[in-house]
């Protein structure tokens, strides 16, 4: 991509190989060896998409900034589920989607956060007419608009924006603090039900037991994860997520999901797996269910 075009090096941290990082969580100790004065940009997820591990925003951002680099956070699996407080934690740039805990549906517009302190020095790689100072000048030279408008590209979907407005109005009314608290309680409930019902059925917990180290979903491992996910949809009316090679993601959407639904969902998982009903499903090579 961009790194190749500009002759830059893209370095990927291996946090997925067993033993490299607990629950795939990136810590300052893991990140530090990769940092030097020639690093320009570091990008990490607030919540690891597969395991549900929560990275510490402030400590990692502070570490990156000490080396003179920018820190870009992907908050797709965090926004609408946990408190992030970008200003307090000194975040430079963040991006994310709105179709997860943003409750706005597939295809809804993504979002970009750029701290006011760095808006003037950063440029957009795609110079669209929405980021042009004079939108209708259509001249030969691009002049970036001041402020956050200088980072827009083109017309967003109005229908998608309407969904976002409705969904985020509800999030604001409910208060992200209360939503984050419910996510912590809901995931704790899931872990307790895993201990009580699922551990003896061949499942393993792939997410931290510490509520400060997870978000709104947990991940369970099972050798037959792919077939179990399909069977849960077809036979039990439970909608999980499968991620290769053997992970099942289970989330509480704090706004609409009740604790009773969490209990019932895990009871259905227990019953389906203990009865081996999932064996009716032929093996699938689907990477996502």
Predicted stretch roles:
Residues 1-289:
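Pyridoxal 5′-phosphate
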């Amino acid at each position: 991509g961009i790194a190749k075009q500009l002759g830059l090096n893209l370095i990927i941290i291996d946090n997925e190989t067993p033993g490299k990082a607990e629950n795939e969580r990136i810590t300052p100790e893991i990140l530090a060896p990769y940092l030097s004065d020639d690093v320009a940009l570091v990008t990490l997820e607030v919540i690891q998409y597969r395991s549900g591990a929560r990275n510490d925003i402030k400590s990692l951002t502070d570490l990156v900034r000490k080396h003179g680099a920018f820190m870009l956070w992907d908050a797709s699996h965090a926004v609408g589920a946990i408190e992030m407080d970008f200003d307090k934690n000194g975040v430079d740039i963040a991006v994310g989607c709105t179709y997860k805990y943003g409750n706005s549906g597939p295809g809804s517009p993504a979002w970009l956060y750029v701290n006011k302190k760095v808006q003037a020095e950063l440029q957009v790689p795609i110079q669209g007419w929405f980021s042009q100072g004079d939108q209708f000048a259509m001249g030969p030279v691009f002049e970036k608009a001041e402020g956050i408008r200088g980072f827009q590209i083109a017309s967003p979907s109005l229908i998608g924006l309407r969904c976002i407005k409705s969904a985020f109005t509800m999030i604001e009314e409910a208060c992200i603090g209360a939503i984050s608290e419910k996510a912590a309680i809901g995931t704790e409930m899931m872990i307790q039900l895993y201990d009580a019902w699922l551990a003896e059925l061949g499942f393993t917990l792939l997410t931290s037991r510490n509520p400060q180290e997870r978000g709104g979903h947990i991940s369970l491992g099972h050798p037959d994860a792919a077939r179990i996910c399909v069977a849960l949809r077809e036979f039990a009316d439970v909608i999980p997520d499968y991620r290769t090679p053997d992970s099942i993601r289970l989330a509480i959407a704090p706004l609409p999901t009740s604790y009773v639904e969490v209990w019932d969902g895990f009871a259905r998982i227990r019953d389906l797996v203990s009865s081996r009903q999932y064996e009716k499903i032929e093996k699938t090579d689907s990477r996502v269910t």
